[in-house]
Amino acid sequence: MSLPVVLIADKLAPSTVAALGDQVEVRWVDGPDRDKLLAAVPEADALLVRSATTVDAEVLAAAPKLKIVARAGVGLDNVDVDAATARGVLVVNAPTSNIHSAAEHALALLLAASRQIPAADASLREHTWKRSSFSGTEIFGKTVGVVGLGRIGQLVAQRIAAFGAYVVAYDPYVSPARAAQLGIELLSLDDLLARADFISVHLPKTPETAGLIDKEALAKTKPGVIIVNAARGGLVDEAALADAITGGHVRAAGLDVFATEPCTDSPLFELAQVVVTPHLGASTAEAQDRAGTDVAESVRLALAGEFVPDAVNVGGGVVNEEVAPWLDLVRKLGVLAGVLSDELPVSLSVQVRGELAAEEVEVLRLSALRGLFSAVIEDAVTFVNAPALAAERGVTAEICKASESPNHRSVVDVRAVGADGSVVTVSGTLYGPQLSQKIVQINGRHFDLRAQGINLIIHYVDRPGALGKIGTLLGTAGVNIQAAQLSEDAEGPGATILLRLDQDVPDDVRTAIAAAVDAYKLEVVDLS
């Protein structure tokens, strides 16, 4: 029996080949050479690339035996994940390969900025000795604010604490209990800005976080603060930061990332108080080596038919055929539970009832977590990293089964509990020969509406004319109602309406609707 073929298309460290083991046949190809790549992939069971080789639909179509594409790095811009998923090809990357390098680089920038090391170095190289011109500031005894407590943010917090600093943090998706476990005081962003002597930013770049540290935020910081951004370009307003340094409010800064890259012209480059590097956070030999060995291990597992860490798509995973159709619905239930919760829940419970309870359904717990975190995490949320994300943010998750399901052959309930004891419950089922997804319950109120598209959920005071006001305001804004269903509260004057719309609802229209019908709660959720 021939060994599976692993095709390496880009230059990788020798340790990568060693990590693949002796149960595969390793071949090499010049991946950027399109013709050579297309000629080599038909016999490949696995394809390993870095950033130089493009793996698109054409390459995938030419590789009928391909089971896994492994990107030795974090980004996946050169891999068509959707095309791979459509062909049942697993896609993996190495999301944790550079976290230590990135954390250390942030600390290097902070230290260099606090002691004016680059400016002092340049001065001495000009054959001048100006000790008095380069007085620095200690980290010991100071308050360091970490904005974003993901994997890298936590590493920075742990390491900076060793300097004798007091660490505070802002992250709306980390529970106070989890922060306490880390020995970190959790603050609002405004409080962190006001208290921190140093601020290090470690957030993903999303519409909500872009420009987070802007002119207004900088004005709230302590005089003499030092700011570091080694996360994503655009989180810090570079022009506003330059003005704050020039004006003397901000003492210094360190940046490894910029809103536009490559960046060779910035007002920050003219300031001696600013330390800049050209996006070097992951540029260490160890990070590159780790990326190769990480994906090699994923390839080894995939070819052995085992569960694969760091998978970024569903289609390549091995899931029971009775359970597979429920994955997307339960993900949507997780999204819905998260949106309806006032804050990130501290616990998530998935109950499987009816015939489906006879199957192995652990993957549905992961699917619900994927949905819960997908709206707040920039990187791909996978069946493997979802539990780690939950652990990092202090969210527990469980799954339970019950054979009884009076109204449906099978139904899945997702229950989210907040730190304040608030509870959100949502339920869904599959129906018909096409296994259409349906929402059947939200917070004890019964529905029968397809789980798809943009949905507006309003819990409001049920008075005559309320529905007309909602329809009029949406219509005036050019938003079409595709489907709607009303469920009245069992007791009291309240009702909940679920409307599926043809587009998102502008913020001002949401505000107007909430005021018009005395809404207790109004949320828009994308269930596409």
Curated annotation (Swiss-Prot):
Its EC number is 1.1.1.95, 1.1.1.399. Keywords: Amino-acid biosynthesis, NAD, Oxidoreductase, Serine biosynthesis. Residues 455-527 form the ACT domain. One of its GO terms (molecular function) is phosphoglycerate dehydrogenase activity. Pathway: Amino-acid biosynthesis; L-serine biosynthesis; L-serine from 3-phospho-D-glycerate: step 1/3. It comes from the Bacteria. The active site is at R232, E261, H279. NAD(+) binds at R151, I152, D171, A230, A231, R232, D256, H279, L280, G281, A282. GO terms for cellular component: peptidoglycan-based cell wall; plasma membrane. It catalyses: (2R)-3-phosphoglycerate + NAD(+) = 3-phosphooxypyruvate + NADH + H(+); (R)-2-hydroxyglutarate + NAD(+) = 2-oxoglutarate + NADH + H(+). GO terms for biological process: L-serine biosynthetic process. Pfam families: 2-Hacid_dh, 2-Hacid_dh_C, ACT, PGDH_inter. Belongs to the D-isomer specific 2-hydroxyacid dehydrogenase family. Catalyzes the reversible oxidation of 3-phospho-D-glycerate to 3-phosphonooxypyruvate, the first step of the phosphorylated L-serine biosynthesis pathway. Also catalyzes the reversible oxidation of 2-hydroxyglutarate to 2-oxoglutarate. Was identified as a high-confidence drug target. This is D-3-phosphoglycerate dehydrogenase. It comes from Mycobacterium tuberculosis (strain ATCC 25618 / H37Rv). The gene is serA.
